Regions:
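Extracellular beta-rich ligand/substrate-recognition surface
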Residues: 7-13
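Short, compositionally biased
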Residues: 104-118
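Short glycine/threonine/proline-enriched tight-turn/helix- or strand-capping micro-motif at secondary-structure
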Residues: 13-20
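Short Gly/aromatic-enriched secondary-structure transition segments
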Residues: 44-52
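Short helix- or helix-capping micro-motifs
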Residues: 122-123
Length: 124
């Protein structure tokens, strides 16, 4: 599926691009973004690029989708989540979500999930 997204490539380097999302894995979910809020945290990430604590150092080679305050609708659910979620259900992303021991978070750190996109892949 194609998505259109605002992607960060580095300091003050944002690009609106259309590209193909990968097929979802069994532990992922394809979703449509309905609304995204912009805030100073996104601005800070765009200005600082790879110097931002949540933006990966290799962002120039692996751009990330900006936007961490968003909601939408589930489109396709991987088999791992089929008993919990269904296509058509609404979702929202907790904006400070990250795993213990890492600062990686949607809207800062990942290639296929961020609020400034039409469609995204929600990872496990």
């Amino acid at each position: 599926m194609k998505t259109k997204a605002l992607r960060l490539y580095g300091k003050e380097d944002l690009r609106l691009e259309e590209f193909e999302l990968p097929e979802i894995k069994d532990d992922e979910i394809l979703a449509k973004v309905v609304s995204d809020s912009i805030c100073m945290s996104s601005y800070k990430a765009a200005m600082q690029g790879e110097d931002h604590k949540r933006v990966p150092n290799d962002v120039a080679e692996h751009p990330v989708i900006i936007g961490h305050e968003f909601c939408g609708e589930l489109v396709q659910v991987g088999s791992k989540w089929a008993d919990e979620f269904q296509a058509g259900e609404k979702f929202s992303i907790q904006p400070a979500l990250n795993y213990k021991g890492t600062l990686d978070a949607p809207g800062y750190s990942f290639q296929y999930i961020g609020g400034d996109a039409t469609y995204i892949v929600i990872p496990n």
